[in-house]
């Protein structure tokens, strides 16, 4: 194999030196204390500041998984993410468990904060854009929750009373009727997407304070709509339903969808 060029060898040795220095860097020993409700977090440097403020050493009480980035997932100390506007690197994310519990109580009702385990509560509100996805994210939970909500929405349409008169055939023909197919025609007039409108779901999430506890990093903090906040709010609510189904079962998740989502949307 050809020898490394001088520039490549210097780069490799520099990276190795930086990695060794990072591995020997002492870790601050602090007790878990009440952290601010929100702090400024960028994708790299500010996340490290959050870890230094709330971290503990391995000899002390172990830190919760949601509160820090694993050491082996960190880079050698520099970032290749070049941002044209430095102001876009700053964003406020919640790190207060009490504030997160207040959201779950408001959205799920009394005792909602105790419905999920501590790690799952944080995972359900964490988007993959936060900390480059190194603390876990809710994509798979959102997929599961989306299927549950689609199923319950379809069921609500099929069991709803008929609001439209049947179409009269101008040729006097009589369509085939069967008890098992009596409710299928209701889907002609109302589709699940008509009820589960993404704008309505996002508005419901904002009303319950989801935007203040959701962990994500918008592309343009000055323009959340262009950064996809509506889609992120929808996927986060879906992920909460998926997490409930995962830990409490499908029956509980379906009841939550009917009582806490469909009922509030007027279905």
UniProtKB/Swiss-Prot annotation:
Signal peptide: none annotated. Residues 43-54 have a biased composition (Low complexity). GO terms for cellular component: mitochondrial large ribosomal subunit. Residues 43-73 are annotated as: Disordered. GO terms for biological process: mitochondrial translation; RNA processing. InterPro entries: Ribosomal_mL57, RNase_III_dom, RNase_III_sf. It is found in: Mitochondrion. Component of the mitochondrial large ribosomal subunit (mt-LSU). Mature N.crassa 74S mitochondrial ribosomes consist of a small (37S) and a large (54S) subunit. The 37S small subunit contains a 16S ribosomal RNA (16S mt-rRNA) and 32 different proteins. The 54S large subunit contains a 23S rRNA (23S mt-rRNA) and 42 different proteins. mL57 forms a heterodimer with mL44 and stabilizes rRNA expansion segments 1/2 at a membrane-facing protuberance close to the point of attachment of the ribosome to the translocon in the membrane. This is Large ribosomal subunit protein mL57. The lineage of its organism: Eukaryota, Fungi, Dikarya, Ascomycota, Pezizomycotina. The gene is mrpl15.
């Amino acid at each position: 194999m050809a020898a490394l060029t001088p520039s490549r060898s210097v780069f490799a040795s520099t990276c190795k030196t930086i990695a060794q220095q990072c591995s020997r860097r002492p870790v601050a020993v602090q007790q878990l204390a009440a952290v601010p409700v929100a702090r400024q977090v960028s994708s790299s440097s500010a996340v490290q500041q959050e870890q230094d403020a709330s971290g503990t050493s391995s000899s002390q009480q172990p830190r919760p998984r949601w509160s820090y980035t694993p050491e082996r997932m960190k880079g050698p100390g520099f970032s290749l993410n070049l941002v044209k506007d430095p102001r876009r690197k700053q964003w406020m994310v919640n790190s207060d468990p009490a504030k997160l519990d207040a959201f779950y109580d408001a959205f799920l009702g009394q005792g909602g904060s105790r419905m999920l385990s501590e790690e799952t509560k944080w995972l359900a509100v964490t988007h993959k854009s936060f900390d480059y996805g190194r603390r876990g994210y809710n994509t798979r939970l959102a997929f599961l929750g989306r299927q549950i909500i689609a199923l319950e929405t379809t069921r609500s349409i099929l069991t709803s009373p008929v609001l439209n008169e049947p179409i009269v055939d101008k040729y006097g023909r009589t369509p085939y009727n069967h008890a098992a197919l009596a409710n299928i025609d209701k889907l002609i007039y109302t589709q699940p997407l008509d009820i589960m409108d993404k704008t309505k779901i996002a508005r419901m999430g904002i009303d319950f304070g989801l935007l203040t506890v959701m962990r994500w990093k918008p592309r343009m903090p000055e323009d959340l709509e262009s950064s996809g906040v509506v889609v992120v709010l929808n996927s986060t609510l879906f992920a909460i339903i998926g997490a409930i189904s995962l830990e409490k079962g499908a029956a509980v998740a379906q009841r939550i969808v009917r009582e806490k989502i469909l009922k509030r949307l007027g279905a």
